Amino acid sequence: MQIEKIDFYGMSAIHFEAGGYEAIMIPEIGANVVKLSHKASGTNILRTPAEDEIETFKGRPQVFGLPLLFPPNRIEDGTYSFENRTYKYPITIPAQNNYHHGIIKSQPFIITRTETGNDYVEIE
């Protein structure tokens, strides 16, 4: 199991391996695993952007990879609280007064912790 920083077409990326699979995530683009492959067979599981598709990927990251969707589903009234902190989001479904998920698929983030085990990788 390993986690390492790599260059992915000029962008800083994280390459990680566990359980016979390898993956790439680009934190500056968002929480989207842009590559997932089975190492032994060489099978690519996700649509990974090629170098000439990077601008398309930046504009429409949902077309490639596997976006991590947080928070799931909808947030009633666009507000929730966690650990004594209240988070407010814009209402994106006015008819239901809800905010819809998908907020981190294209938001840059900073990795604060990594961990590897015999058959897993954790990235926060």
Located regions from the model:
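Surface-exposed acidic/polar loop and edge beta-strand patches at domain peripheries
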Residues: 1-124
